[in-house]
């Protein structure tokens, strides 16, 4: 085995190092790098096919992240005990890795390329997602694949003291108000061009704001985008050091030979421009998406008919002609924006489309909101549930459950098309995660609002930024559901067109402007704080001043949208919907948890059956936490009263008569419930009206109601009972039948007392046996009776 090549450098502002290593693992891979921070490490490989697959008219890049449970010292919890489909975290890391890398490959490179990150170890302190980006860039740099890198990436967190922390641990992230993941490349002038941004507020950010932490607004965010450049440069420098070490050890890196693929030749483009430029110039002024697409398709059909028929100059090149039509359409759209400041639908560069908002669109839902901006329409539905509906996670991070769920669905009919309907694709998972990240900071914690929340965004119509439409409709449905969020959240998608040194920022982009532009820039937030940001660019980065101006332009649009949303619903409803469960949370002494649950859940199950409420019991090591929920409030209140009666049972009074119910039968008597949480012992000697009886079951059965009088309460609170009035005389049989029944025989275990002796059990012994659990689980209908401490056991 060859000696590995390893380079390492300290991360400024921390006590940790970033390490890159190659030559130890995956020797047959074209590029393979292990990246490490702390004890978290990933192996990323990069490989490309030698030839272009026939018929491929796009760059076939795939990025996969393989999370191995052994990295965290776990065995997968699935039935087969091995990893299956990627987790949501893995899919999001795939997208995070893909987005900055894709525009950095050489133009015309169409060879199938695959990047695979395998998580080898996690220390539960350092996340592995940013390592994947840096390792992928390094692997591509030593692979020979035509990649215009290196790219560096960093996560920074904004602390409550107003400082940006590089590569924060999980604990540091939880204690911060905002996180930024930024990837970029270093320019010739030493500046860093930002290629990708993924950012959002933390779950407790608004709690920190209430305690005085500085809010993250546009100026703070712009400062963060500038601050991150030092750590991006450090990563890039380390990758260059690795490349230099590889060359010094193994010689020059052999580049992958490939033939650039051109979608069309300049001659084809010129012919298309001559044939249909006028038709396309007219088509790109049509505001309605379907009509515009129809006009563009008609122009493409005309070009194909004119240029590709038998004997024509470009016969057999239909695909090239169609690509040239698309390229000409893009050119015309961009030219009109830059030169005239007019967009496809006639708007100016800062104009919003018509915006509308509604709530309560689904009467049976707990909360619902409908948001529309132009031809983009999204309905969001909020469902509230008990905390036990939190999603359990099997991840490689310290997070093991999720209580705020956002599911995004975009069926093909939202674009007037046909297609596959079913499980979500990576895009849908990514859009749902972005919308969740934008809204989660304003959602109250589970301690303040005990519900599990599931939000579902249904895209009804798509023409630009359905993810930000999901943010707006989520905010509407949460307020309609009565969730006390800390402020309405709106979102907007911005675009950019760059021609030479001229940058034009677009507000509220259409789908076509997204496709033909140079940047997709999404911003979400409340009136005074940003909660999420996502940026992707197709060019060599965006200057800092352009980004700062775009943030301010986005703020103007967000505030306009908030006005429309506030007109629909200005504040969360005072109460949750009638159809939603009503939830109350109680804190009880931890030593009472067992009493509330009962043996094998007997007590809590009985309360649930009698009240119809849903009850869950947990503890945090110091106190017990009881959560009670029911759609009807009275059911919740009844269950609450029953729990409180167990925790602090009412006191019985000596000499008072109670109507009780037999809840347990032992060989020495019957336990009778006389008050919620309060039982007393009716000794066998008090039964039978002065006559000796051989078994309690001769006169009482479980569930019988009986009037009893409190005879004695000892200093430990144990209650002794006697029957009120005439003692019970037995079951359904006549007195004669009972008297004619032969006496019970006593069987004894080896070493027991003489046969026929009746065991004498004291009042204290009876209670102690019951409390110690010696009597077993005596539910309704049970025949089992616990034996005494001397080994004797009665048999019928």
Where do the language-model regions lie?
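Glycine-rich, flexible beta-strand/loop modules in the N-terminal catalytic cores of phosphate-handling
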Residues: 29-114, 119-126, 193, 197-210, ...
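Flexible, glycine/charged-enriched surface loops at secondary-structure junctions
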Residues: 107-113, 148-150, 235-255, 290-291, ...
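Short glycine/threonine-rich beta-strand-turn micro-motifs
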Residues: 295, 303-304, 308, 620-631
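Short flexible coil/turn linkers enriched for glycine and charged/polar residues
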Residues: 1-3, 12-16, 26-29, 37-41, ...
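Long, charged amphipathic helices and adjacent flexible linkers at domain junctions
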Residues: 256-258, 262, 560-587, 633, ...
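Mobile "lid/hinge" segments at catalytic clefts and subdomain interfaces of large enzymes
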Residues: 145-284, 478-574
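Intrinsically disordered, low-complexity mixed-charge segments
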Residues: 610-611, 616-624, 630-668, 674-678, ...
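Extended amphipathic alpha-helical scaffolds
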Residues: 1-49, 53, 150, 247-397, ...
């Amino acid at each position: 085995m060859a000696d590995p090549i390893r380079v390492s450098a300290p991360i400024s502002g921390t006590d940790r190092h970033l390490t890159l290593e190659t030559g130890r693992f995956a020797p047959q891979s074209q590029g393979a790098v292990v990246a490490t921070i702390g004890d978290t490490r990933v192996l990323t490989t990069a490989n490309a096919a030698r030839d272009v697959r026939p018929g491929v008219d796009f760059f076939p890049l795939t990025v996969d992240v393989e999370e191995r449970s052994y990295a965290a010292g776990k065995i997968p919890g699935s039935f087969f005990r091995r990893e299956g489909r990627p987790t949501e975290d893995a899919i999001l890391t795939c997208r995070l890795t893909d987005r900055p890398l894709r525009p950095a490959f050489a133009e015309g490179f169409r060879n199938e390329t695959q990047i695979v990150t395998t998580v080898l170890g996690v220390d539960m302190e350092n996340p592995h997602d940013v390592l994947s980006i840096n390792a992928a860039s390094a692997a591509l740099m030593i692979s020979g694949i035509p990649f215009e890198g290196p790219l560096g990436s960093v996560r920074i967190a904004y602390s409550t003291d107003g400082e940006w922390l590089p590569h924060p641990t999980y604990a540091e992230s939880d204690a911060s108000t905002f996180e930024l993941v930024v990837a970029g490349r270093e320019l010739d002038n030493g500046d860093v061009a930002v290629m990708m941004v993924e950012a959002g507020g933390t779950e407790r950010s608004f709690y920190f704001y209430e305690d005085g932490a500085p809010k993250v607004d546009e100026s703070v965010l712009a400062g963060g985008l500038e601050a991150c450049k030092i750590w991006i440069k450090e990563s890039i420098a380390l990758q260059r050091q690795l490349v230099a070490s590889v060359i010094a050890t193994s010689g020059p890196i052999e580049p992958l030979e490939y033939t650039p693929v051109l979608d069309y030749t300049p001659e084809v483009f010129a012919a298309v421009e001559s044939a249909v430029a006028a038709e396309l110039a007219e088509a790109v002024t049509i505001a309605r998406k379907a009509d515009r697409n129809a006009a563009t398709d008609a122009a493409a059909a005309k070009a194909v008919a004119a240029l590709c028929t038998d004997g024509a100059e470009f016969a057999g090149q239909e695909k090239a002609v169609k690509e040239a039509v698309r390229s000409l359409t893009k050119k015309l759209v961009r030219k009109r924006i830059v030169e005239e400041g007019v967009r496809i639908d006639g708007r100016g560069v800062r104009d919003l489309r018509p915006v509308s908002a509604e709530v309560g669109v689904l009467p049976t839902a707990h909360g619902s909101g409908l948001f529309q901006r132009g031809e983009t329409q999204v309905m969001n539905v909020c469902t509230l549930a008990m905390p036990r509906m939190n999603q359990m996670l099997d991840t490689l991070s310290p997070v093991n459950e999720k209580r705020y769920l956002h599911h995004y669905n975009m069926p093909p009919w939202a674009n007037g098309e046909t297609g596959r309907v079913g499980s979500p694709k990576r895009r849908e998972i990514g859009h749902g995660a972005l919308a969740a990240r934008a809204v989660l900071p304003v959602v109250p914690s589970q301690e303040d609002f005990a519900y599990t929340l599931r939000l579902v965004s249904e895209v009804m119509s798509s023409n630009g930024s359905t993810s930000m439409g999901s943010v707006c409709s989520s905010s509407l449905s949460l307020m309609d559901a009565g969730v006390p969020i800390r402020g309405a959240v709106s979102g907007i998608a911005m675009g950019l067109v760059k021609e030479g040194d001229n940058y034009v920022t677009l507000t509220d982009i259409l789908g076509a402007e997204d496709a033909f532009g140079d940047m997709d820039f999404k911003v979400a937030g409340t009136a005074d704080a940003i909660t999420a940001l996502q940026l992707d660019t197709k060019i060599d980065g965006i200057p800092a001043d352009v980004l700062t101006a775009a943030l301010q332009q986005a703020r103007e649009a967000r505030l306009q949208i908030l006005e429309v949303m506030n007109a629909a619903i200005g504040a969360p409803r005072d109460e949750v919907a009638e159809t939603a469960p009503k939830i109350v949370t109680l804190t009880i002494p931890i030593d009472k948890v067992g009493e509330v649950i009962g043996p094998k859940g007997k007590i809590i199950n009985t309360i649930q059956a009698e009240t119809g409420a849903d009850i869950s019991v947990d503890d945090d090591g110091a106190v017990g936490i009881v959560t009670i929920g029911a759609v009807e409030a009275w059911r919740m209140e009844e269950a609450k009263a029953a729990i409180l009666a167990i925790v602090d049972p009412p006191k019985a009074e000596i000499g008072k008569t109670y109507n009780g119910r037999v809840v347990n039968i032992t060989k020495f008597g019957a336990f009778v419930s006389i008050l919620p949480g309060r039982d007393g012992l009716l000794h066998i000697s008090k039964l039978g009206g002065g006559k000796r009886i051989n078994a309690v079951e001769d006169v009482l059965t479980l569930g019988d109601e009986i009037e009893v009088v409190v005879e004695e309460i000892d200093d430990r609170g144990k209650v002794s009972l006697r029957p009120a009035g005439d003692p019970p005389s037995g079951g359904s049989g006549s007195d004669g039948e009972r008297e004619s029944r032969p006496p019970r025989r006593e069987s004894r275990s080896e070493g027991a007392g003489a046969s026929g002796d009746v065991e004498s059990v004291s009042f204290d012994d009876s209670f102690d046996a019951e409390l110690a659990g010696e009597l077993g689980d005596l539910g309704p209908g049970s025949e089992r009776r616990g034996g005494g401490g001397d080994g004797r056991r009665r048999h019928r």
